[in-house]
Amino acid sequence: MAPPWVPAVGFTLLPSLGGFLGAQYTRGEGFRWYASLQKPPWHPPRWILAPIWGTLYSAMGYGSYMIWKELGGFSKEAVVPLGLYAGQLALNWAWPPLFFGTRQMGWALVDLLLTGGMAAATAMAWHQVSPPAACLLYPYLAWLAFAGMLNYRMWQDNQVRRSGRRLSE
């Protein structure tokens, strides 16, 4: 049997795995494309994003461990709170390929809005089980709102129009 700390570490690190894989889209050609975009003055510097995401991913991961532990593992009672969490995490991981990989800022915004909705539903479900676990999602919800505003602004500011028609992003 695994030591009791193994699930806590695993749950805490899991979100960062997808974040690390998604970060691969921000390198090379994806980074050059992103650097060429118009950005609002309130755009965060690139160097701060990894610490922010690392903190948010660790907090949500540990919160998921708290829910898992409180509900006795992957029990029937855990299906909704952990299912919502898994859904929002999958949507979160889909954003970098959409934004940087396909350069579809509009679809990336749709993904962010869905992620925010699922994350809010996750926080509400977690609150029923463990209010402290739900509190670990609040900074993430705030960051998703900020990221959504930034994504929207960049999408709007970088659309090319000819003859009243939008070109593909």
UniProtKB/Swiss-Prot annotation:
The source's domain of life comes to Eukaryota
The record's annotation in PANTHER family points to: PERIPHERAL-TYPE BENZODIAZEPINE RECEPTOR, TRANSLOCATOR PROTEIN
- Which residues are on the Mitochondrial intermembrane side of the membrane? 1-5, 68-79, 127-134
How is this protein organized at the quaternary level?
Interacts with TSPOAP1. Interacts with MOST-1. May interact with STAR.
Show the stretches that span the lipid bilayer.
6-26, 47-67, 80-100, 106-126, 135-155
> How does the record say this protein sits in the membrane?
Multi-pass membrane protein
- Tell me which species this is from: Bos taurus (Bovine)
What does the similarity note say? Answer: Belongs to the TspO/BZRP family.
> What keywords is this UniProt entry annotated with?
Lipid transport, Membrane, Mitochondrion, Receptor, Transmembrane, Transmembrane helix, Transport
GO biological process entries: lipid transport
Per its UniProt record, what Gene3D superfamilies does this chain match?
TspO/MBR protein
Q: Which GO terms describe its cellular component?
A: membrane; mitochondrial membrane
What's the protein called, per UniProt? Translocator protein
Segments on the Cytoplasmic face: 27-46, 101-105, 156-169
Describe its function: Promotes the transport of cholesterol across mitochondrial membranes and may play a role in lipid metabolism, but its precise physiological role is controversial. It is apparently not required for steroid hormone biosynthesis. Can bind protoporphyrin IX and may play a role in the transport of porphyrins and heme. Was initially identified as peripheral-type benzodiazepine receptor; can also bind isoquinoline carboxamides.
Subcellular location per UniProt equals:
Mitochondrion membrane; Membrane
